[in-house]
């Protein structure tokens, strides 16, 4: 059996920009993408803690170390600058892999810089 499991998440990131006129996606600081093992164009789910919105999109790299979290395209209607979000990536795993897999959880501070928890 195959299972759809959480691979990683960036927890409580703060939206730094929203660009309605971009084609789509979420721009994420390249450093955070690497820490969370999220590749460019990988599908991610975004959960907005402020308003309860949830949506799927794909990740694109932002400038390394910038703290950028920018919601692009139509999804910009679902988030505002300053909103707190969770960005989740998933992977398909067989039962044995899923039982032993430990997802990467990246906590960030108010500037979207990684912190140890």
Curated annotation (Swiss-Prot):
It comes from the Bacteria. GO terms for biological process: alanine biosynthetic process; pantothenate biosynthetic process. The keyword Lyase applies. The keyword Amino-acid biosynthesis does not apply. Pathway: Cofactor biosynthesis; (R)-pantothenate biosynthesis; beta-alanine from L-aspartate: step 1/1. Keywords: Autocatalytic cleavage, Cytoplasm, Decarboxylase, Lyase, Pantothenate biosynthesis, Pyruvate, Schiff base, Zymogen. Its main location: cytoplasm. Its EC number is 4.1.1.11. Its cofactor is pyruvate. Transmembrane segments: none annotated. The modification Pyruvic acid (Ser) is found at residue 25. Substrate binds at residues 57, 73-75. It is found in: Cytoplasm. InterPro entries: Asp_de-COase-like_dom_sf, Asp_decarbox. It catalyses: L-aspartate + H(+) = beta-alanine + CO2. One of its GO terms (cellular component) is cytosol. Binds 1 pyruvoyl group covalently per subunit. The active site is at 25 (schiff-base intermediate with substrate), 58 (proton donor). Heterooctamer of four alpha and four beta subunits. HAMAP family: PanD. Belongs to the PanD family. NCBIfam families: panD (TIGR00223). Catalyzes the pyruvoyl-dependent decarboxylation of aspartate to produce beta-alanine. This is Aspartate 1-decarboxylase. It comes from Thermoanaerobacter pseudethanolicus (strain ATCC 33223 / 39E).
């Amino acid at each position: 059996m195959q299972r759809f499991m959480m691979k990683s998440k960036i927890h409580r990131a703060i939206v730094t920009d929203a660009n309605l006129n971009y084609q789509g996606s979420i721009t994420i600081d390249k450093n955070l993408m690497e820490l969370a093992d999220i590749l460019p164009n990988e599908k991610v789910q975004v959960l907005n803690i402020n308003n309860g919105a949830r949506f799927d999109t794909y990740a694109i790299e932002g400038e390394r170390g910038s703290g950028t979290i920018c919601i692009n395209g139509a999804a910009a209607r679902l988030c505002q600058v300053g909103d707190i979000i969770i960005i989740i990536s998933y992977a398909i795993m067989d039962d044995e892999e899923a039982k032993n897999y430990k997802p990467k959880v990246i906590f960030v501070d108010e500037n979207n810089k990684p912190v140890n928890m």
